[in-house]
Swiss-Prot record:
Belongs to the D-mannuronate C5-epimerase family. One of its GO terms (molecular function) is isomerase activity. GO terms for cellular component: extracellular space. It comes from Azotobacter vinelandii. This is Mannuronan C5-epimerase AlgE6. The gene is algE6. Composed of one catalytically active A module and three R modules.
Length: 874
C-alpha cells in the first residue's frame, strides 16, 4: 500500500519543515504492517529529530521511501541546522530492522548552510552488539553535499543491496560498507567526495562490488580496510569491473584484509599507485587495465607492501602474502617506477603470471624469496611528453624518450638510445650502445638557454654517437658541417659542438661525462657522407647577397662584405677588412692585420626578438682592429652613455663588447669574440668615434626588458625598470627606483635610494610542483626599501595562509623568504627571497599589502584532511 506524504501535511515547497509529516506517513505505513511512503516531485525540507542517532527520518520494518526520481524528489536539510545528524534517513538505533529501503530520490545535506557532521543514509543495529539489520534495498538514490558520509550502512547489516546510485561532493566518503555481510554495491558512482569514493571497512565479509565507478575523489577511489579499531579484518570481497580514476591517492587500496579479488576494472590517472596491497593476504588482481597512474607522486603502478601496526591498536605486523597478479595490462605514466613492485619488508609469495607491462622503468621488482614472475611480456620502455625515467632490460633494445627531460638507462645489451626533445641524461649500460640524435632540437643550445643531452657512461672503445641525420660530416672547428670537441675547465666533461645555428637559432651541442677529447674520432661517431669543399676554388667571392653566404678571401688583403643573411666570412692571408652586414655572421680574418667593421647597429645586435650578434673567431688584439666609429661609440665603459662594456662568458671562452642602450627599434649593439680578450681590448685595437660628453645626473627614462634573459640598468635618477619574461637581472643604481622583474627567476638590485620591488602577478615569483621560480632581492634595505605585493591580495604577515605571508630564514641565516603556502589553480604559490637575514625587520612598514576588510574575512575550514586518509568510517 502507498502512503502519499502530502496526505499527511507535507508541502514539498522548499521552505516548510516537512519532517513531522513525512515521519507520520512512515509510522502509518509501519502500523499497517508495511508499505511504500511516496514523495511526489518537490523539495522537502527536514530538521533533526533530536539526538544524533535519531537522524531526521526513521524507517521501520517493511517500509520503503520512494520519490519521483533523482533530482525531482529532494529531501534537504533545513538552513541553519547546527547539530550532528547520523543519517538524514536511517533505521532506528538498537532495533533490528528488516525489509526496508529507499529509491528514486535525492538527499541533500546543505553543507554550505549547516554546522556539524551530517550523514545522508545510515542504517545498522548498534556497534559491538549481536543484532543486525536485514534485507535493505537502496536504488537510484543521489546523496550530495553532506558534511559527513554519503551512504553509510553500518554494523551489522545482512544482505544489503545498493545499486544505480550516486554520491558526490560529500565531506567524507561517498559510499561506506561498515561490517556488511553478504551485501552488494552495483552500478554506483562516487565522485568529488573529499575523502574516498568507496570505503569497505570493519569486518565486512562476503561482499560484492560490481561495475562501480569512482573518480575525482580526494582520497582513494576504493579502499578495503580494517579501520582504526582492532576488529576482524574484511574478507572475501569481490571487486568486479568498474572504473577508478583521477582520485587523489590510490585507485584501489586493499589494507589489512583477506581474500580480496580485484578483477576486470579500469584503474587509471590516480595520484599514487593504481592498486596498493598493504598488509593483506590472499589478494588477487586479475585481468585489469591499470595505466597512467602516479600522477602526483613517483610510484609503481601496482605496489605490494606489508603494514606495521606494532605501535597501533593490534600491536601486530601484517605481512602481505600470497598476492596473485595475473592477466593484467599495466602501462606506466611519466612518474611510474615499476609495473609491479614488492617492498623489501617481508612481503612474499607473490605470483605474477601472464601480465603485459609497458612504459615503466622496470616491469617487476620483487624482493620475496618465494615470489615469482612467469609469462609476463614487457615491451622496451617508450617515453611520453613528460619527464620520463626509462630503464631497459638485459637484452639489446631501442629506448626512445620523446619530449621532456628524460633519464634513459639501457641496462645490458647493445642498445639504441634516443632521448628525443628535452634535456636528457643517457646511460647506455653494459654492451656496445648507440646514442642517436635525429633532430637538432633533440640536443642543442640557443639564445633561450642550453638544452643539450648528457651521456653519462660513453665508452669510446665500443659505443657510438650517431649524428648522421643532422648532416655533420666530421670533426673540425664546429663550422661548415663539422663538430668541434672541447673540454670543460675542470676537464670532467667533453662537448661536441656545432657553431652553426639553424633558422631558430639552435646549434647542436652534446655533453659527455669524462674527458674523451683524445679518443673521439670517426671510429665512434657516425657522420653523414662528406662533401669536400676546396676554399681556393672560390676566386673572389667578396660581396655577399641577402642569403646565408660563405665568402672566402685570398692570400691578399681585400674588403669582404657579407650583405644580408647569416654569413661566414674568411679573410685568409693579407690585411683584410671584413664587414658582415646584417644577420648573425661569423668572421675569420686569418693571417694579417685585419679590421672588422660595423657600420650599422642592425649588423650586430640583440633585441627583444633575440640575439643577432656577429662572432669573430680569431681576433688578434696585437694587430687586428674593431671599427665601431660609424655607430658613435666613444670608448670603453659600463655600456651606457655611448660606451661599450667588456664582459667574458662564465667559462672564459668568449668575450663580449656590449652597449646596454637601445635604438628606436629596441636594438642594442653586441659583438662576440672567441677567446678571453678582456684584458687586451683598448682604444689601441678599437676604432671609436669622437666622444661627446654626457651629463650622468640626467634622470633616465623607463627601462623595459624583453621575454629573454635581460640585464637592465638604471641611471643615477629614479625610474621604473621592468623585466618582462625571462630570468632577468635588474640594477637600479641611484635614485628611488621601482623594480618589477616580471615573469621568470629574476635578480633585483635597487642600489642607492628608497627602492620599491613590485610583484604584480603570482607567476612573477613563485614555486610550484615543477620547481622554484622565485625572484631574489640582492640588497634590500628594510629602513627605506619596500616590497609591493598589494596586487596579489596579501593582507599582512602571518603563517602563510588566509592571505598572509610567512617569514622564514635559511638554515645558514644568509637568506630570508616571504612565502604563501596557498596555491592558485595552476599550483603556483608566491615566494620571494631576500639576501641576508631580515626576519626581525620585515613589517607592514616596508611591505605594501592589499587593503583589508575585516568584516568580510571568513574562516577557512579544512575538510577531509584528518591526516589519516585510510581511517575507517566511524
Amino acid at each position: 500500500m502507498d502512503y502519499n506524504v502530502k496526505d499527511f501535511g507535507a508541502l514539498g515547497d522548499g521552505v516548510s519543515d516537512d519532517r513531522v509529516a513525512i515521519q507520520a506517513a512512515i509510522d502509518a505505513a509501519h502500523a499497517a504492517g508495511g508499505g511504500t511512503v511516496y514523495l511526489p516531485p518537490g523539495e522537502y525540507r527536514v530538521s533533526a529529530a533530536g539526538e544524533p542517532s535519531d537522524g531526521c527520518l526513521t524507517l521501520r520494518d517493511n517500509v520503503y521511501l520512494a520519490g519521483a526520481g533523482m533530482g525531482q524528489t529532494v529531501i534537504k536539510l533545513v538552513d541553519g541546522s547546527a547539530q550532528k545528524i547520523t543519517g538524514i534517513v536511517r533505521s532506528p538505533f538498537g532495533e533490528e530492522t528488516s525489509n526496508f529501503g529507499m529509491r528514486d530520490l535525492t538527499l541533500d545535506g546543505n553543507r554550505a548552510n549547516t554546522v556539524d557532521k551530517v550523514d545522508g543514509w545510515f542504517n545498522g543495529y548498534a556497534p559491538g552488539q549481536p543484532g543486525a539489520d536485514r534485507n535493505v534495498t537502496i536504488e537510484r538514490v543521489e546523496v550530495r553535499e553532506m558534511s559527513g558520509y554519503g551512504f553509510d550502512p553500518h554494523e551489522q547489516t545482512i544482505n544489503l543491496v545498493l545499486r544505480d546510485s550516486v554520491a558526490h561532493h560529500n565531506g567524507l566518503d561517498g559510499f561506506v560498507a561498515d561490517y556488511q555481510i553478504g551485501g552488494t554495491f552495483e552500478n554506483n558512482v562516487a565522485y568529488a567526495n573529499d575523502r574516498h569514493g568507496f570505503n569497505i571497512v570493519t569486518s565486512t565479509n562476503d561482499f560484492v562490488m560490481r561495475n562501480n565507478v569512482a573518480y575525482g575523489n580526494g582520497g582513494n577511489g576504493l579502499v578495503v580496510q580494517r579501520g582504526s579499531e582492532n576488529l576482524a579484518h574484511p574478507e572475501n570481497i569481490l571487486i568486479d569491473g568498474g572504473s577508478y580514476y583521477d582520485n587523489g591517492l590510490e585507485g584501489v587500496l586493499v589494507k589489512m584484509s583477506n581474500n580480496v579479488t580485484v578483477q576486470n576494472a579500469d584503474i587509471h590517472g590516480n595520484g599514487s599507485s593504481g592498486v596498493r596491497v598493504y598488509g593483506a593476504q590472499g589478494v588477487q588482481i586479475l585481468g585489469n587495465q591499470i595505466h597512467d597512474n602516479a600522477k602526483t607522486a613517483v610510484a609503481p603502478e601496482v605496489l605490494l607492501q606489508s603494514y606495521d601496526d606494532t605501535l597501533g591498536v593490534s600491536g601486530n605486523y601484517y605481512t602481505t602474502l600470497n598476492t596473485r597478479v595475473e592477466g593484467n595490462t599495466i602501462t606506466g605514466s611519466a612518474n611510474s617506477t615499476y609495473g609491479v613492485q614488492e617492498r623489501n619488508d617481508g612481503t612474499d609469495f607473490s605470483s605474477l603470471v601472464g601480465n603485459t607491462i609497458n612504459g615503466v622503468q622496470e616491469a617487476a621488482h620483487l624482493y620475496g624469496p618465494n615470489s615469482t614472475v612467469s609469462g609476463t611480456v614487457s615491451a622496451p620502455p617508450q617515453g611520453t611528453d613528460g619527464n620520463d625515467v626509462l630503464i631497459g632490460s638485459d637484452v639489446g633494445e631501442q629506448i626512445s624518450g620523446g619530449a621532456g627531460d628524460d633519464r634513459l638507462d639501457g641496462g645490458a645489451g647493445d642498445d639504441l638510445l634516443d632521448g628525443g626533445a628535452g634535456r636528457d641524461r643517457l646511460t647506455g649500460g653494459l654492451g656496445a650502445d648507440t646514442f642517436r640524435f635525429a633532430l637538432r632540437e633533440d640536443s642543442h643550445r640557443s639564445p633561450l638557454g642550453t638544452f643539450s643531452d648528457l651521456i653519462l657512461d660513453f665508452d669510446p672503445s665500443q659505443d657510438k654517437i650517431d649524428v648522421s641525420a643532422l648532416g655533420f660530416i666530421g670533426l673540425g672547428n664546429g663550422y661548415a658541417g663539422t663538430l668541434a670537441v672541447s673540454l670543460s675547465a675542470d676537464g670532467l666533461r667533453t662537448y661536441l659542438k656545432s657553431y652553426d645555428a639553424d633558422a631558430q637559432g639552435r646549434s647542436f651541442e652534446l655533453a659527455l661525462d669524462g674527458n674523451h677529447a683524445a679518443t673521439l674520432s670517426a671510429g665512434n661517431i657516425v657522420f653523414a657522407a662528406a662533401t669536400p669543399v676546396d676554399p681556393s676554388a672560390e676566386a673572389q667571392p667578396i660581396v655577399g647577397s641577402d642569403l646565408d653566404d660563405q665568402l672566402h678571401g685570398t692570400l691578399l688583403g681585400e674588403e669582404i662584405s657579407g650583405g644580408g643573411g647569416a654569413d661566414q666570412l674568411y679573410g685568409y692571408g693579407g690585411g683584410d677588412l671584413l664587414d658582415g652586414g646584417a644577420g648573425r655572421d661569423r668572421l675569420t680574418g686569418g693571417e694579417g692585420a685585419d679590421t672588422f667593421r660595423f657600420a650599422l647597429r642592425e649588423d650586430s645586435h640583440r633585441s627583444a626578438a633575440g640575439t643577432f650578434s656577429d662572432l669573430i673567431l680569431d681576433f688578434d688584439p696585437t694587430q687586428d682592429k674593431l671599427d665601431v666609429s660609424a655607430l658613435g661609440f666613444t670608448g670603453l665603459g659600463n655600456g651606457y652613455a655611448g660606451t661599450l662594456a667588456v664582459s667574458v662568458s662564465d667559462d672564459g671562452t668568449r668575450t663580449y663588447l656590449k652597449s646596454y642602450e637601445t635604438d628606436a627599434e629596441g636594438r642594442s649593439f653586441e659583438v662576440s669574440l672567441q677567446g678571453n680578450h678582456a684584458a687586451a681590448l683598448s682604444a689601441d685595437n678599437i676604432l671609436f668615434a669622437t666622444p661627446v660628453p654626457v651629463d650622468p645626473g640626467v634622470e633616465g627614462t623607463p627601462v623595459v626588458g624583453s621575454d629573454l634573459d635581460d640585464e637592465l640598468h638604471g641611471t643615477l635618477g629614479s625610474e621604473q625598470i621592468l623585466g618582462g619574461g625571462g630570468a632577468d637581472q635588474l640594477y637600479g643604481y641611484a635614485g628611488n627606483d621601482l623594480l618589477d622583474g616580471g615573469a621568470g627567476r629574476d635578480k633585483l638590485s635597487g642600489g642607492e635610494g628608497a627602492d620599491t620591488f613590485r610583484f604584480a602577478l603570482r607567476e612573477d615569483s613563485h614555486r610550484s610542483p615543477l620547481g622554484t621560480f622565485g625572484d631574489r632581492i640582492l640588497d634590500f634595505d628594510p629602513s627605506q626599501d619596500r616590497i609591493d605585493v598589494s596586487a596579489l591580495g596579501f593582507s599582512g604577515l602571518g603563517n602563510g595562509y588566509a592571505g598572509s605571508l610567512a617569514v622564514s630564514v635559511s638554515d645558514d641565516g644568509t637568506r630570508t623568504y616571504l612565502k604563501s603556502y596557498e596555491a592558485d589553480a595552476q599550483g603556483l604559490s608566491f615566494e620571494v627571497a631576500l639576501e641576508g637575514d631580515h626576519a626581525a625587520a620585515l613589517s607592514a612598514d616596508n611591505i605594501v599589502f592589499a587593503a583589508t576588510d575585516a568584516a568580510a574575512a571568513g574562516e577557512l575550514g579544512v575538510i577531509g584532511a584528518s591526516g589519516q586518509p585510510d581511517d575507517p568510517a566511524v
